[in-house]
From Swiss-Prot:
The gene is deoA. GO terms for molecular function: 1,4-alpha-oligoglucan phosphorylase activity; thymidine phosphorylase activity. InterPro entries: Glycosyl_Trfase_fam3 (IPR000312), Glycosyl_Trfase_fam3_N_dom (IPR017459), Glycosyl_Trfase_fam3_N_dom_sf (IPR036320), Nuc_phospho_transferase (IPR035902), PYNP-like_C_sf (IPR036566), PYNP_C (IPR013102), Pyrmidine_PPas_bac/euk (IPR018090), Pyrmidine_PPase_CS (IPR017872). This is Thymidine phosphorylase. Its EC number is 2.4.2.4.
Length: 443
């Protein structure tokens, strides 16, 4: 028998906690025998004194096991359970294509996603722009769609990882969100509760990233790779660039349009293509569907070119209550804003730098993101045709189009976009889309 205050004292004194002590504390979080004050004190002790990898693995697995852990064995699936998670960015629409692409290659993708908060968009908000799509199906429907379509993208259900829900809300209110140990456990407990065989982790770097520096992004990527593999799920982290909007747009309906256009081949943003292929190929290799990245890319390009990925996306949408002809007729179903107009820079030159976070906040100001949980979104607003770094900008070439519901909202977003996209005299050096892979063998 342990005492919560003694566990807190040990961590306060920078001692190493045993797996049993961590399990006891997490059980207390879940069943309310540990108080809010004790959880806050524990979080602060971890924030200042950190955890070693064994402690992080114990915390992650205890939180994962605090609720239901999905088990897919009874469905007799003929492929691996694979998934991707992103630390979040602006114009990060990858999940919408990656899930169907991986499923079209023989994987099964039960993707449990989140909503947007702050400057980053949320995958579920994008799906909420699709009429009828149910992001909170019951377990039976979720399993049915995973089995029949190969992919289902839904929200976190109440019985998954209850310990994280309580712990995270307290961390948010007590300034302990930024701990790498606690971030690792929060992200992975939710992902691993989906019963995954393999996971590709997208850790963003740059002005639109969650972590403020490259070094901290790399530290988080290493922690996630070590802990996930230690917890029994094959995992690789990719460090990817978020110094500019990833897709050509940012918002909800606008990103769904770009995702469908990507899958049908109508338009594929080259940066979005590179990061999507990198993550998806890694999922196929980790899941044993392909023996190396080159083979995985051949398979992925084939399911894009033959329309199978787009067909599976359509099957998922209709399976979860959306229109059966969504892929063919998405413009009929997705909302449009009252005003769609270009923004021009004040001078000619090259797009030399981008404050991606500020562009994300411009979408929030338009009504396409949340200032606080529970805010109601306008799915029609956002940015589209956003220029890329290195593009030549002049009086004929806008830096973006703004989708707004009023002149006032347009003017506010226009000022924010002009401030966030810097125009210089010289073309900047090209930055890579993927900085590096961190595999288990790299640790």
């Amino acid at each position: 028998m342990f005492l919560a205050q003694e566990i807190i004292r040990k961590k306060r004194n920078a001692e190493v906690l045993s797996t049993e002590e961590i399990q006891f504390f997490v059980n207390g979080i879940t069943n309310n025998t540990v108080s809010e004050g004790q959880i806050a004190a524990f979080g602060m002790a971890v924030y200042f004194n950190d955890m070693n990898m064994d402690e992080r693995i114990a915390l992650t697995t205890a939180m994962r096991d605090s609720g239901t852990v999905l088990d897919w064995k009874s469905l007799d699936l003929n492929g691996p359970i694979i998934d991707k998670h992103s630390t979040g960015g602006v114009g990060d629409v990858i999940s919408l294509m990656l899930g169907p692409m991986a499923a079209a290659c023989g994987g099964y993708v039960p993707m449990i996603s989140g909503r947007g908060l702050g400057h980053t968009g949320g995958t579920l908000d994008k799906f909420d722009a699709i009429p009828g799509y149910n992001t909170e199906p019951d377990s039976a429907l979720f399993r049915k769609v995973v089995k029949e379509a190969g992919v289902a993208i839904i929200g976190q259900t109440g019985d998954l990882v209850p310990a994280d829900k309580r712990f995270y809300s307290i961390r948010d209110n007590t300034a302990t969100v930024e701990s790498i140990s606690l971030i690792t456990a929060s992200i992975l407990s939710k992902k691993l509760a989906a019963g995954l065989d393999a996971l590709a982790m997208d850790v963003k770097v740059g002005t639109g990233a969650f972590m403020p520096t490259y070094e901290l992004s790399e530290e988080l990527a290493r922690s996630i790779t070590a802990v996930a593999n230690g917890a029994g799920t094959k995992t690789t982290a990719l460090l990817t660039d978020m110094n500019q909007v990833l897709a050509s747009c940012a918002g909800n309906a606008v990103e769904v349009k770009e995702a469908v256009d990507f899958m049908t081949g109508a338009y594929r943003n080259p940066r979005l293509y590179e990061v999507t292929m990198g993550l998806c190929a890694e999922m196929l290799v980790l899941g044993g569907i392909a023996s190396n990245e080159a083979e995985a890319r051949v398979k992925l390009n084939a399911v894009l070119d033959n329309g199978k990925a787009a067909e599976i996306f359509g099957r998922m949408v209709s399976g979860l209550g959306g229109p059966a002809d969504f892929v063919e007729n998405y413009s009929k179903y997705l909302p449009d804003s009252q005003i769609i107009r270009p923004v021009y820079a004040d001078r000619a030159g090259f797009a030399s730098a981008m404050d991606t976070r500020e562009l994300g906040l411009a979408v929030v100001t338009l009504g396409g993101g949340r200032r606080k949980p529970g805010d109601v979104l306008d799915y029609s607003v956002g940015l589209s045709k956003v220029c890329a770094l290195g593009d030549e900008i002049n009086a004929d070439k806008p830096i973006a189009f703004i989708h707004a519901q009023s002149e006032g909202a347009f003017a506010e977003a226009e000022a924010a976009v002009k401030k966030a996209i810097h125009i210089g005299d010289t073309k900047p050096d090209k930055t890579p889309e993927i900085y590096r892979y961190i595999r288990e063998s790299d640790l």
